[in-house]
């Protein structure tokens, strides 16, 4: 989807201050309040803005560890395996990938015991032929928002 300058400015303003009022947003972008309302609604209807959420600090709520797991999955079982994995509340991302793995899974866990449980309960389900678990030691950058422009 092509975004014009006004759309880009609105998105950047919302990334900086997601709780900004519509009036503040319009002022920041330099457009009329009605225009801001119409543009925001349009961005939501087109799926550019998928929703509104809270950005939590995982460690502050007890998720001490993050793991990245590469999976090799039997041919013909990819979708079923991924759906089952995605249903686990500790899992926050499941990707189809190219390269050495068929899928990459990212999960947050509280401790080593939970890593053991996750490995035995989730990463050993039927259809997974091999898993490669990597524990994140330090996070340099993590963001759920990536603007589609410079």
Give the label of every model feature segment:
Residues 1-150:
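A compositional/biophysical signature of low hydrophobicity enriched in polar/charged and small residues
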